Amino acid sequence: MLIIQLISGFTQSEKAWNGVQELREKLLSELDDYSSLSVRIRLDEWSANWRAIARQMYMLRERYPQEPLTVLVFAYSWGVGNGLVRLARQLNRFGIDIETAVISDGVYRHWFSLGNWRVILGDRRIVLPANVLSVQGFHQETSYPMGRQPLLANGKQCDPWTKIRLEHVEMDGSRDWHRRCIRVTKDAATRLVGGITSVPAAAPASAALDSRISNGSEP
């Protein structure tokens, strides 16, 4: 089972369309052939209840014990500095890794709101927990705040670390970031899911599921 977690930035919400929502639509289009039982996409705001979300992923793993669980995270701005960091910490409680994170101009978020002025000075860097196994990143040096290369607790480097000529508020819509997220997703789906007719063992029975398995496509 492949879970793709998207995390939006600190000025973004459901009230206005943004680049992370557009990325979700692109991924849904690219993955349309796959069963939504096997490939699942989530989009949450940076300040979401990451403890509950991590527990939901753990419960999915328990619900389908024969299915290896793989998590990818695509995050922007505070979606990196808060969302990705907190999700990884909570997933670690359940022994779940994030196989790959692809980040766009990730910004450090201090636990105390007045501490966030240090972000402007550029003296704080995001530290990603060791269960974030690999990171690919994009950043800009055109406007403040600027994303800095995160530190990985597992000792690895963010690779590649690519500079883009956009302002911070435009980085969620970066075509380069979107293309990389799509490529990472498609590679993982091909490698891990097995095929468009693949569904988790012990999935609830239905006529639609039988049709997918027998015909190799949606009814």
Language model segments and positions:
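Extracytoplasmic/periplasmic, Sec-exported soluble proteins
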Residues: 12-19, 45, 76-79, 127, ...
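Serine-dependent carboxylesterase/thioesterase catalytic core
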Residues: 2, 57-151
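Generic hydrophobic alpha-helical segments
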Residues: 53-61, 84-88, 181, 185-192
